From Swiss-Prot:
Assembly behavior: Homotrimer.
Function: Catalyzes the deamination of dCTP to dUTP.
Binding site for dCTP: 112-117, 136-138, 157, 173, 183
Gene3D superfamilies, A to Z: 2.70.40.10
First-level EC class: hydrolase
GO biological process terms, semicolon-separated: dUMP biosynthetic process; dUTP biosynthetic process; nucleobase-containing small molecule interconversion
Keyword Nucleotide-binding among UniProt keywords: yes
Pfam family, one: DCD
Protein name: dCTP deaminase
Leader sequence residues: none
EC number: 3.5.4.13
Keyword list, A-Z: Hydrolase, Nucleotide metabolism, Nucleotide-binding
Pathway connected to this protein: Pyrimidine metabolism; dUMP biosynthesis; dUMP from dCTP (dUTP route): step 1/2
Annotated source species: Xylella fastidiosa (strain M12)
Length: 191
């Protein structure tokens, strides 16, 4: 597998709808000229933004976190330009961008250093071949203080790995009817 460059990312987004909406350059300021956490195409990746839709984890029901029987009541829904994550807690969000991953591509998501240096970790599982949807993002606040996430700004970087022509997967995410195929909005755990 080889990592793909900005040229390839632009081509795939424009000609094949791999990322929408798509920013071909790197945006570092908002429309008023204020500096923001950058998003858009980078040398070997694409920096995604999170939407204004957040689910903030709380333990108001003193429940046990169980991925097989997740209690949706453990979240508070927030729609805002800013999300405040409680100390040692987490929040879910989703990308503004909708992805359509080709069969011969695997996408790895890494957090942006701006957030990591503040103790805010972004976790996303790989975007598998032929998966499509909005990416659900998980932000962990590892600090003992509240932490802030900004909507409509960069939060994570996607790296695109392309398989060699003779090594394309036999079974894609779509082939096996993956449970998160076509997800929109912030998607909670499914079993």
């Amino acid at each position: 597998m080889s990592i793909k460059s900005d040229r390839w990312i632009r081509h795939m987004a424009k000609q094949h709808g791999m990322i929408a909406p798509f920013e071909p350059g790197q945006i570092k300021q908002n429309t008023t000229g204020q500096r923001i956490v950058s998003y858009g195409t980078s040398s070997y990746g694409y920096d995604v933004r999170c939407s204004r839709e957040f689910k903030i984890f709380t333990n108001i029901n003193s429940t046990i976190v169980d991925p097989k029987q997740f209690d949706n009541g453990s979240f508070i829904d927030v729609e805002s330009d800013v999300c405040i994550i409680p100390p040692n807690s987490f929040a879910l969000a989703r990308t503004i961008e909708y992805f359509r991953i080709p069969r011969n591509v695997l996408v790895i998501c890494l957090g942006k250093s701006t957030y990591a240096r503040c103790g805010i970790i972004v976790n996303v599982t790989p975007l598998e071949p032929e998966w499509e949807g909005h990416v659900t993002l998980e932000f962990s606040n590892t600090t003992p203080l509240p932490a802030r996430i900004y909507a409509n700004e960069g939060v994570a970087q996607m790296l695109f790995l392309q398989a060699d022509p003779d090594d394309v997967c036999e079974t894609s995410y779509r082939d096996r009817n993956g449970k998160y195929q076509g997800q929109t909005g912030v998607t909670l755990p499914r079993t």
